[in-house]
């Protein structure tokens, strides 16, 4: 193996052992800079010689199937590796040309056992609400939240819980597939092959599904087909970007979905947020990203779950200004799970 190959594997192993979700490789005129995304925060990791950084960039581009000679345009690609303990890891590599350096961001997706749904919410009563939703046989369940807030992790956990409760045919349509699961029929987008969400949804509906999961509703076509699939007697789960749970209604209306269709088909809208818990060692939520406390315990999710009467009121009023997550933050403060400073930072 070449030296740069060994260096790249060592870097990936260090990131995985630290629990990093992303690796950022950038540079100045003098040297290369490596940073890890740990618990939602960007943390400096290492400075390396500029020549080594440039060779690492070329290596990751080649491994991800990118054009190593193209340095003027952004590129994105993927690669799969087995690094440690025989756990496969999917890497999504993205490049961005800058005046000084071709920056690279690498998203890490370890293909390990999905989280149990009960372990995700900080407030345990919300786990039961999520489990209850998966007893539904039809309708549209939407998850919203910021990038990196754990929406897809929650979706996988909800699907896994549904599968444990009854034998179901679950079809997922994703870009990319983040967790391979042999119990699901998984379909990955490929724009070069003209495999879009629209194509995937049409194919999924012909595949006799009980449950359809859509990685993200991005445009009007996907939104319309998601609603149509739910109207034809399927349970559909999807993520969508909006400011809060109520803002999801406005977002879908802006995409051209009729409000009366939403009233008929939507069974729940879930806003999700990851918050930092108090560290029992540092006695604070503001401890070092490299704290030795187990990384997967440092953050937990809170939810604003709109269903039943509250959902119907939101669909009638269509008021996106109310943020239900604020109520859950205050509840978490009262229970001593998080600090008031953390809640205020999230509310900004």
Curated annotation (Swiss-Prot):
Q: Which residues bind ATP?
A: 145-152
* CDD domains in UniProt: PulE-GspE-like
Which NCBIfam families would you find in this protein's record? ATPase_ComGA (NF041000)
Q: Which key words tag this protein in UniProt?
A: ATP-binding, Cell membrane, Competence, Membrane, Nucleotide-binding, Transport
- Membrane topology term: Peripheral membrane protein
- GO:BP terms for this protein? establishment of competence for transformation
The entry's protein name is: Competence protein ComGA
PANTHER family, from UniProt? COMG OPERON PROTEIN 1, TYPE II SECRETION SYSTEM PROTEIN GSPE-RELATED
Q: What does this protein do?
A: Required for uptake of DNA by competent cells.
- Record's subcellular location: Cell membrane
Instruction: Please give the family membership noted in the entry.
Output: Belongs to the GSP E family.
| Cellular component, GO annotation | plasma membrane
GO molecular function terms attached to this record: ATP binding; ATP hydrolysis activity
* Main location class: membrane
